[in-house]
């Protein structure tokens, strides 16, 4: 049996933020949710989140995580004190306890699984994750024999000059035999510079301590301030881009683009500079995104181009051209082979197959049929000051430039709207609609 305890009680004062540190965003998710996701594949029997500072906010953020148990640490008196709070919660539990940190979000699931498997196969009381750092200054050094058995952990300030040449460091991630740990946790003391109880001290109290070295030291990067947050964001973004490039996606300027882990791409997608994908995005084969575009929680079919545009909570069919400077807002649905052009905004509207909204238009709360041509400057006046109303335009209809369709209104199929018209009444199939004043010329005006 396996229980997981995630340490998430710290104040994170160096963040200088109103937001709890573990709720800081990283590539579209929070730090602590990334840690929770990384260990989900182990299917632990118990998942404990140790909270303290702004505990209520952390709990509210994680209400959708079924089976997650919250353990409150008050006051926050070190990592050992945090795990002591688990003692009554896991009374009678017989298995392993995996201890993770809520501010170490880059751990791969495979690394965690390897740590747990090695711990189980070795029969150790504790197995700690270690990392070899190019610059280990400030980190505790781990000393072990060739079989990986840990003899001691020495804090940097206590190391001799010779010991400081050892670059094997403690990553602060452990897998314990829970019963053995529970027996020694009460023995921890706060006889140190910080006056806190350190979980590290349990290693010296347990007879058999082993270690597993992480292959990529970047996985155990902790986050304490905005600089480290930015560094982890860059590392995670590079990891995501490299994965998708190996899957057939082209980034013409990778470092200028960002993704979320919930993005999915078909083959031969080209992502141009300064293009950002957030949330859950599903991008079909052969799409060209950017430059300078934002796509969020959107579904794009095959062969879609998005140039200098924003697509948010929208669904787009195949072979659609969007932009430049278009804005597809929530509820926009664009069918196959449409053209959404310069400075066009579409909100909560369905645009039928082959239709074109090419220039300077606002289409809101509307249903456009197939092969509709919307003239430059056409506006659906959907709001009466109290409620939004629907505009319906039938197949093969077209509006002239600078037309206003005052909703609620229905235009039938094959309707033509004269340029400059303001329409307030329904138009039958095949009709010409004109709603403008007669041109008046007064000669000799000046």
Swiss-Prot record:
Protein's name according to its UniProt entry: Bifunctional protein GlmU
Quaternary structure note: Homotrimer.
Record's catalysed reaction(s): alpha-D-glucosamine 1-phosphate + acetyl-CoA = N-acetyl-alpha-D-glucosamine 1-phosphate + CoA + H(+); N-acetyl-alpha-D-glucosamine 1-phosphate + UTP + H(+) = UDP-N-acetyl-alpha-D-glucosamine + diphosphate
Lineage summary: Bacteria, Bacillati, Cyanobacteriota, Cyanophyceae, Synechococcales
Family indicated by similarity: In the N-terminal section; belongs to the N-acetylglucosamine-1-phosphate uridyltransferase family.
Organism: Prochlorococcus marinus (strain MIT 9313)
Pathway: Nucleotide-sugar biosynthesis; UDP-N-acetyl-alpha-D-glucosamine biosynthesis; N-acetyl-alpha-D-glucosamine 1-phosphate from alpha-D-glucosamine 6-phosphate (route II): step 2/2; Nucleotide-sugar biosynthesis; UDP-N-acetyl-alpha-D-glucosamine biosynthesis; UDP-N-acetyl-alpha-D-glucosamine from N-acetyl-alpha-D-glucosamine 1-phosphate: step 1/1; Bacterial outer membrane biogenesis; LPS lipid A biosynthesis
Gene this chain is encoded by: glmU
Required cofactor(s): Mg(2+)
Protein residues bound to Mg(2+): 103, 224
């Amino acid at each position: 049996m396996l229980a997981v305890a995630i340490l998430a009680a710290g104040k994170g004062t160096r963040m200088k933020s109103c937001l709890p540190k573990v709720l800081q965003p990283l590539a579209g998710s929070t730090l602590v949710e990334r840690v929770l996701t990384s260990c989900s594949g182990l299917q632990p029997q118990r998942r404990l989140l140790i909270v303290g500072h702004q505990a209520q906010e952390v709990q509210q953020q994680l209400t959708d995580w079924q089976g997650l148990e919250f353990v409150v640490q008050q006051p926050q008196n070190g990592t050992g004190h945090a795990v002591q709070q688990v003692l009554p919660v896991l009374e009678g539990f017989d298995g392993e306890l995996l201890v993770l940190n809520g501010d170490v979000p880059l751990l791969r699931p495979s690394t965690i699984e390897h740590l747990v498997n090695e711990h189980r196969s070795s029969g150790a009381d504790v197995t700690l994750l270690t990392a070899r750092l190019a610059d280990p200054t400030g980190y505790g050094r781990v000393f072990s024999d060739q079989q990986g058995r840990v003899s001691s952990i020495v804090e940097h300030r206590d190391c001799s000059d010779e010991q400081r040449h050892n670059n094997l460091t403690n990553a602060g991630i452990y897998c314990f035999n829970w019963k053995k740990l529970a027996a020694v946790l009460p023995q921890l003391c706060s006889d140190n510079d910080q006056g806190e109880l350190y979980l590290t001290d349990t290693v010296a109290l347990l007879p058999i301590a082993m270690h597993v070295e992480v292959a990529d030291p970047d996985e155990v990067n902790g986050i304490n301030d905005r600089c480290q947050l930015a560094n982890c964001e860059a590392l995670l973004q590079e990891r995501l881009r490299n994965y998708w490039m190996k899957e057939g996606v082209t980034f013409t300027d990778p470092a200028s683009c960002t993704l979320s882990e919930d993005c999915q791409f078909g083959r031969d997608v080209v992502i141009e500079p300064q293009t950002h994908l957030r949330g859950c995005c599903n991008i079909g084969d052969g799409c060209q995104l950017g430059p300078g575009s934002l796509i969020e929680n959107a579904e794009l079919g095959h062969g879609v181009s998005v140039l200098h545009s924003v697509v948010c909570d929208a669904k787009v069919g195949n072979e659609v051209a969007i932009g430049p400077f278009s804005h597809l807002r929530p509820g926009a649905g664009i069918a196959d082979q449409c053209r959404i052009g310069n400075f066009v905004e579409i909100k909560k509207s369905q645009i039928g197959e082959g239709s074109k909204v090419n220039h300077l238009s606002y289409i809101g709360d509307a249903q456009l049929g197939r092969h509709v041509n919307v003239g430059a400057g056409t506006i659906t006046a959907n709001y009466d000051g109290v409620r939004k109303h629907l505009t319906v335009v039938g197949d093969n209809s077209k509006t002239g430039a600078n037309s206003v369709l005052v909703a609620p209104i229905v235009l039938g199929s094959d309707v033509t709207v004269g340029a400059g018209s303001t329409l307030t009444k329904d138009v039958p199939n095949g009709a010409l609609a004109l709603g403008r004043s007669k041109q008046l010329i007064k000669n000799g005006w000046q």
